[in-house]
A protein has these predicted regions:
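Conserved N-terminal alpha-helix of the aminotransferase class I/II PLP-enzyme fold
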Residues: 13-61, 83-88, 94
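Conserved PLP-anchoring active-site segment centered on the Schiff-base-forming lysine
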Residues: 71-89, 118
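Conserved C-terminal alpha-helix-loop-beta "cap" of PLP-dependent enzymes
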Residues: 74-76, 268-342
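PLP-dependent aminotransferase-class I/II
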Residues: 99-144, 151-158
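Hydrophobic beta-strand scaffold residues
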Residues: 102-103, 170-172, 281, 308
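Active-site C-terminal subdomain of aminotransferase-like
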Residues: 108, 135-136, 142, 150, ...
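Catalytic PLP-binding core of fold-type I/II PLP enzymes
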Residues: 151-183
């Protein structure tokens, strides 16, 4: 059986394992106060072209989302997100559990628009009765979205303009950031994210690391005592150098970007195979997540040799996700493409 069910089903890049082995007998300070975290921070600051950015490493994406939103919001403030956003659907109400409301907006292919955000914010800021409502203070986006789609540079600029108008923070969940950056039609860079957002993160877990996410915080108000929020929410790893070392190993030689771009290219081969058979797509995605609508017969045929993720029922059958990753091989894709041709 070959796994196309997610992008976190393998261990780590060989370069990371080699670096871990080479340093295994060395000792380092704890809690991220080590030379490897400093080294990774320096690389990331160079990539985002911001020496003033605060870089912090946390073990997982849900922790990153929880800590950022907790640090950004007071008890009477809320977060605007797509109704398909990870914080709204896949994090066991972690945001609500900290006392913050999610103002969920209807998505179009996983995205929300500047117009929707402006209307939501205006309902509070221009509504005249703020004491009865939560104050929208942060906008949460994902890049790529849960449906594998991307925001364009212009869309992000438009959303940023709305956030500035209403004094809201802009936060981008980068749990698959590498695959978004590697897509053929992407027109955003890490530097753009640093300039247009207040905080975002670069994924490690799904892009070649054993674990870890690198938060990039450019807004000074969010930087203030941020590590205390991390500790309060269980996101400070005692052996913090393990994350710094992994990001340094992936980013210094550009392997991170090579592997994620390659994963996108492999996903396009899968997409082309389904298109050639006339299999309908649930959404147009240029990233490593491809969503197709399979009949029961087609689904059963492919399930004999492959793991994939079922997303729910559709009029013509079942929405199924095929997901490539940094570890996907050409041979695995060739096998799937051949079996798709037999459908």
């Amino acid at each position: 059986m070959i796994r196309f069910n997610n992008d976190y089903n393998h261990g780590a890049l060989d370069s990371i394992l080699s670096a871990l082995t080479a340093t295994n007998t060395e000792s380092f300070p704890g809690y991220g106060e080590d030379i490897w975290c400093r080294r990774a921070e320096a690389v990331i600051k160079q990539l985002v072209s911001s020496e003033d950015a605060l870089i912090k490493f946390v073990p997982g994406a849900t922790q990153a989302n929880l800590v950022v939103i907790a640090a950004a919001l007071s008890p009477i403030q809320s977060v605007i997100a797509a109704d398909t956003g990870h914080i709204n659907c896949h994090e066991a109400a972690s945001i609500e559990n900290t006392g913050h409301k999610i103002l969920a907006l209807s998505n179009t292919d996983g995205k929300i628009t500047a117009g929707q955000i402006a209307a939501c914010a205006a309902a509070y800021y221009d509504g005249g009765a703020p004491e009865y409502l939560t104050e929208p203070k942060l906008v949460y986006l994902s890049f790529p979205t849960e449906k594998g789609t991307l925001y364009s540079a212009q869309e992000l600029r438009d959303i940023r303009e709305v956030c500035q108008k209403y004094g809201m923070y802009l936060f981008v969940d980068g749990a698959r950031m590498g695959y978004g950056l590697g897509a053929a039609d992407n027109d955003l860079t890490l530097k753009d994210f640093a300039e247009l957002t207040d905080v975002f993160y670069i994924c490690g877990t799904k892009c070649g690391a054993l674990f870890g996410e690198a938060l990039v915080i450019t807004e000074p108000r969010l930087q203030y005592r941020f590590k205390a929020y991390m500790k309060q929410h269980g996101a400070v790893l005692a052996k913090g150098w393990l994350m710094g070392l992994q990001f340094a190993a992936m980013l210094e030689n550009g392997e991170y970007f090579e592997k994620t771009k390659r994963a996108d290219a492999l996903a396009m081969q899968i997409r082309e195979a389904f298109a050639a058979k006339g299999v309908p797509f649930w959404v147009e995605s240029s990233t490593n997540q491809q969503f197709v609508i399979l009949t029961q017969r087609q689904k059963e045929a492919l399930a004999r040799g492959y793991y994939f993720e079922e997303e729910g029922a559709a009029e013509q059958g079942t929405v199924v996700r095929f997901c490539t990753s940094w570890a996907t091989t050409q041979a695995e894709v060739d096998a799937l493409v051949a079996d798709i041709a037999k459908l």
